Curated annotation (Swiss-Prot):
UniProt xrefs under SUPFAM superfamilies: S-adenosyl-L-methionine-dependent methyltransferases
Protein keywords: Biotin biosynthesis, Methyltransferase, S-adenosyl-L-methionine, Transferase
Catalytic activity: malonyl-[ACP] + S-adenosyl-L-methionine = malonyl-[ACP] methyl ester + S-adenosyl-L-homocysteine
Gene that produces this protein: bioC
Top-level EC class as recorded in UniProt: transferase
One BP annotation, GO: methylation
The name this protein goes by in its record: Malonyl-[acyl-carrier protein] O-methyltransferase
Source superkingdom: Bacteria
Entries under InterPro entries matching the protein: BioC (IPR011814), Malonyl-ACP_OMT (IPR050602), Methyltransf_11 (IPR013216), SAM-dependent_MTases_sf (IPR029063)
EC number(s) recorded for this UniProt protein: 2.1.1.197
């Protein structure tokens, strides 16, 4: 079970640094935009769920200048950053809200879009049902989330460390949704013309501590393992970092894989 309060607080604290460290998230945003353009949609009303600092909303505003864009994010710090970035003309369209409980009327939007957000939910059902609820007939739902395979190097190294350190404890890494789970959740929510696929994005860091710091800087620290208490917990983390560097390190540093699941469906 994911503690949503911890997620909210982490992204609240990471809001100011997010854009400087979210390189993969920016590439994902551009990919989802290319999917929208390929769909040929011309929405009049757009909802951005988990809008973060407003980067996607700005790009959507450039592409659809006459569209009314509403942004929601669970974290107060992110919503505040989005208001600053979007400027006064869009300030009234930014709200603090939960993807699982949208404070919005039924059938309002032609497009609901989200990137790098839904992986922080325990299940996808409520958020997908809410997205469908606020969509108008024939409205489009397009999203990207980090799926199973994300941080596979970190997970493999951490599990190896748990097995090698006596009383190392349990696996504390975040569980990401599989592509099949995403597709099934869309079907349960009642979406039609569903398309789901995944792509890998690989980011390189100088070393493992630098990677872990970057993840924490963008508020996503809950995706990385948390050391248990005491000496054994410290040994697990030390062993994990050494194993990561030995198994996966190279001339470019250490890789961190993000498996991005993209989904599109119509109401």
């Amino acid at each position: 079970m994911i503690d949503r309060r911890k997620v909210r607080n982490a992204f609240h604290r990471g809001a100011a640094d997010y854009d400087a460290y979210a390189a993969v998230q920016k590439r994902v945003m551009e990919r989802i935009l290319s999917l929208l353009f390929a769909e040929g949609v011309e929405p009049a009303r757009i909802l951005d769920v988990g809008a973060g600092t407003g980067a996607l909303a700005l790009r959507l505003a450039d592409r659809y200048p006459s569209a009314a864009i509403t942004c929601v994010d669970l974290a107060h710090g992110m919503a505040r950053q989005a208001r600053d970035n979007l400027g006064r003309t869009m300030e009234r369209l930014v709200a603090v809200a939960d993807a699982e409980h949208l404070p919005l009327r039924d059938g309002v939007f032609d497009l609901v879009v989200s990137t790098s957000t839904f992986q922080w939910l325990t299940t996808l059902d409520r958020a997908f049902a809410e997205a469908r609820r606020v969509l108008a007939d024939d409205g489009l739902f397009a999203f990207a989330l980090f799926g199973d395979g994300t941080f596979k190097e970190l997970k493999a190294s951490y599990r190896a460390a748990l097995h090698s350190v006596p009383r190392g404890g349990r696996d504390r890494t975040h569980r990401f949704f599989t592509r099949d789970e995403v597709r099934a959740a869309l079907a349960r929510a009642g979406f039609r013309s569903v398309e789901v696929f995944d792509e890998d994005e690989v980011e390189y860091h100088p070393d493992v501590p630098a990677f872990l710091r970057s993840v924490k800087r963008i508020g996503a620290g809950n995706a990385s393992p948390v050391a248990g208490r005491g000496l054994s917990g410290r040994r697990v983390m030390e062993t994990m970092m050494r194993t990561y560097a030995e198994r996966f390190g190279g001339a470019d540093g250490i890789p961190a894989t993000y498996t991005v699941v993209y989904g599109v469906g119509k109401r």
